[in-house]
Amino acid sequence: MPYLTTVSPAGGASIANLSFVSVVPPRFAASHAAVRRHLRNGIDGSVISEPLFVGYRTTSLSPTSTPDRASFYTYERFLATLLFLAIILACGLMPMQPDTLWQLRAGRDMWQSQHVLLTDVYSHTAYGSFWPNHEWLAEVIYYAMYRFGGLPMVTLFATALIAGGWAITWRLAKGPVRAVFAWTALALVPASLWWEPRPHAFSLLFVMTTVFLLVRRRYLWLPLVFVVWANCHGGVLLGFVILAAGLGVRTLMAPRVWWQAALIGLGCVLAATATPLGLSFWTEIPKSLMRIHSYPIDEWRRPNVMDVHELLFWVIAIAFCGTLFRKRRTLSGAAAGDLTLYACALAVLPTAILAVRNVGPFLMIAVPAMTSLVLVRRERAARRETQRPLLNLAVMSSAAIAVTMTIVWAYRNEIPHLHWAPVPASALVALGQCPDNLYNRYDEGGYLVWFAPDRKVFLDGRQDPYPPDLMRDHIRMETVGGDYKAAFSRYGIHCAYLPAVSPTVAQLSTSGWKTLYHDSQWVVLRD
């Protein structure tokens, strides 16, 4: 039976007083002696001649030894596997959003035309207007995935982006694997609310990539990350919040080299202008955000403390701030990487409080920050810990097979939950009998842009090209049943595609409009 041996360096500042744990069977005693020599060498500051890969949450053996293959299936890997299988399953079964579909249409048009689309060509209300398409690269990439494998590949690609971001979160976390697992599992509940396949998935990956580069002080890679990010999603502005926090910590710790942080920041700013928008990027994106906050768009609302899922965000945020305040006197002795994590999490927290879509990025940073703040030291005394590698392997394999089969079954049967065919074929036929121009809601416009490409829509999920007055009139019509006649007359509307629950349906029916299609969800009407 293997014995759990704990080696804790006595005050070695160079290894941050962490306890290093290795499971050492008797036949690897010689290798374990190398571990002890390695630690002593590190503490003394002398040159370490024996290569060793050791970590607080990894099993360590000498490279010259031949470990039992079963030792690979540790409890740590067991928990990590279950966690990431849950992420893959949740992402893989996320419903397709209307935004994803108009983005696929834009990606297809740019793929075919070989130029970036910066004017509206999808609506009859803003046709030809300027459209600050700051997500053009993500749209093209998603369409490339669609060409390769259809909507399943689009979903799986977004899954890879999101899982990659959480893998960095897991990599930056410290402490016992049970604690890391617990914090991550709690964070996944509110964070998973916005995992649909769309450009936001790029931001989830790039947020953690930026944090990782700041923590590891690999600053030269940051401009490259920002030039790609700025062409994929407007969430790059959140990246600049993180960048300012991380470089601010570096400047405070090494004020004499402030100019290095300034150069890195300048490089990232210049990288963000390397987009089709050019310098107007710095005016168009803030204007877009200001317009968004004036509309009741769900993902831009504040997190609701009464919602059982979003409540966990508040719990983690309060725990993080409270722990940070309680340990404020000891922060001067914290490692630079830990201080960077704390600063980045604090910087992103206000954005998460203001908009629920930023809850995920905050939690991805807060998890490793919390594990660092509440790091549990292991006792020096050796204790027994039972490893069950065969059981771990069996459960991991069973879970992986179950997740794979579930996703394959869902994709093969195109279950309604996926929303891959949200517009019924009969409704599309009815639309063909309907004269221009069309009226539809903001929420469903993306569906029509993709599934009815020959029709110009009234609105879709791109709020940028549309006049604010048009958006506000539409909101009144669909929330309080405002008068539709002025808008219909102004835009020459003679056809409507609406959900059956829309208050406009009742008004049009009362006014004598003819029903061309009707089911429990959708209605097509004409005058």
What are these regions (language model features)?
Residues 383-434, 443-445, 452, 463, ...:
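Membrane-proximal, lumen/periplasm-facing interface regions of secretory-pathway glyco-
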Residues 125-152:
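Short hydrophobic/aromatic helix or loop-helix immediately within or flanking a transmembrane segment
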Residues 87, 187-191, 208-213, 220-234, ...:
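Membrane-interface alpha helices of multi-pass inner-membrane proteins
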Residues 111, 237-333, 363:
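Transmembrane catalytic cores of multi-pass membrane glycosyltransferases
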Residues 471-523:
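Periplasmic/luminal catalytic loop of GT-C fold multi-pass membrane glycosyltransferases
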Residues 207-220, 322-330:
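Membrane-interface transmembrane helices that cradle and orient dolichyl/undecaprenyl
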Residues 432-470, 489, 494-500, 525:
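Short periplasmic/luminal acceptor-recognition loop of GT-C membrane glycosyltransferases, typified by
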